[in-house]
Amino acid sequence: MKRTLLLCTAIAALFAACTTQQKKAWAHLDQDTLYVVASQFKAGAEMAALGDSANVIHYVLKERAEVPFSQSAIRQSTDEAKQGPVADEPFFTVRFTLPIPASYTPTEQGEMAGLDYGVFHHCHSPGFEVMPNGDALAIYFSSPRGRSESDTMATFVQARLRFGAEEWDMPELFFDTKLGNDQSGLLWNDNGKIWFFGGGRYMSNYVPFRIATSEDNGATWTYSIPQLDTAATDFTAQPINSAFRDPAGNIYMAMDADDSNSFLWRSSDEGKTWVDMGGRTLGRHSTIIPLDEEGTLLSIGGKNASLEGWTPQNISRDWGATWEEATPSPFPPLGSAQRPSIIRLQSGNLVYITDSYMLKKDIPAPEGWKNEDKCVIAISKDNGQTWRIKSLPVALPHNRRTAHPSLGYSTVRQAPNGLIHILTSANYPALHYELNEAWIWSDEGEVTISKEGGEVKAYSEKYPNGQLKAEWEAKTYPNGRYLLHGTTTDYYADGTVQHKVVYQDGRKTGEELFYNPDGTLRWRWERNLETMRGVWTQYYPNGQKRVESHWNIEPTPRDLNRKFIGYVAEGPATHWNEDGTQKAVYEFVKGEVVEN
């Protein structure tokens, strides 16, 4: 009876909150069931919420036919993840995160090159986190060219950088809400438990985001719908990049409000029910960090707001229930396709990343800014009272506004080994940085990282039942860095081979094989580290070739004359029917189709 009364009250509140414009935008969501296509997801306790038509929307998981490689062959050991470069020597490296295609090609060309369905040209607003096992995981929303970010065709896609590897795995579908919008992700490592908060426009004022949690480094996930007592108001269904707990165990998660503001959600029951904290910052995409255990928070940015020519910052003394009047920060303001990020490091220092130039409105940094138009990283020993600000020596511009470098919708995180990771978006393509505090405090630019010497050691991991799960080799270099080096073999629980590859100083070389659980070959890579070329062949279950594509594995991007570790399609991509007859051939040059 209590639940019925609650539903009735909530429905009445929902109708009161709905504007004509919102009802029109939600017209496609008059059904009672939304199917969520994913792999190795299980339903949580809460899988329904009120809809806009006085109905209850049920979210139903639909299993994919195949488990993505991003959720396969994932080690659970955390010991190796603590190995890293010595802390007192500057360390800096940068690589591609995403391949071309799909990144910002003139038409949708990802599937032509063999990428998973749902990986479209626009991969943006990512959640990013370093897993307990040291892997880096990025979850972007992805929307097709010619469709808006709030379109129902938008998906969430995932990409993984395995600990000790130098190159990211190919992006694959994370989940796809059929007839619903997937937009803007946030990943948070909650002391070993990984939380994903995914936005999505126009589902319901009672569904401002969705939740997925993992306790095995992102191999499997539990999906759930947040429970709200009243309809959300003054919000945009876009999580940002900040989440944290208070000393009492309450969870806070940052989200965009309407217009140029941001706010915090709070859950006091491990993510089941949520309330809007009430306060609003002066800035869309604000990045937020606790300054103490008493409720003092610092919010900086993020876009579409400035104060005396600088990006605004706010202080809250009550966990975001209210915010003091904004003051100018020491950083330039941001605009469209730009977002800052802040975290507290293991050392206790704060680190903050941002751009210097407002791209869309073509506004340079205010007078007194000393870092020109560069992307910057800043570090503070005194809770943000003063900052050391340093330019990143390598950066790419926005994919269309190419005059100035940009981190796009940036996220910064720290790995168990102390390295600082930065993920960008909206570049051609997105980049991933690894660096340490010693580099920030130093005057070094790019650093030459030696791969000479080192000791190779064999490792293994077992399933809980004692069955061998993985065996691999890795090298620890004189500076402490750990990279995969030698043969890696992963096994299914029944003992059959799942995946096999050879690494050379963190780079995959020669043949790489990935098998289905029934023993059939799903795909094969052949890489040559002398020519820096690779061939990716995918197979039907009957053993016939499905797609074979050719790749440059040390490409030079369009906007910077510098080689990166990454993937750009170069040469033919041939498609076959299941009976072996040829279906299509696409010729790629520098990641784009020139002939088919």
Model-derived features: where do they sit?
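Sec-dependent N-terminal signal peptides
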Residues: T4-A13
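Compositionally biased, intrinsically disordered low-complexity segments enriched
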Residues: C8-T9, K23-K24, K42, R160, ...
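Asp-box/BNR beta-propeller blade signature and adjacent active/binding-site loops
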Residues: T20, W26-V456, T531-M532
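A compositionally biased, intrinsically disordered/low-complexity signal enriched
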Residues: T20-Q21, A54, L483, V568
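Glycine/tyrosine- and acidic-biased, solvent-exposed loop/turn segments at the edges of beta-strands
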Residues: V447-N596
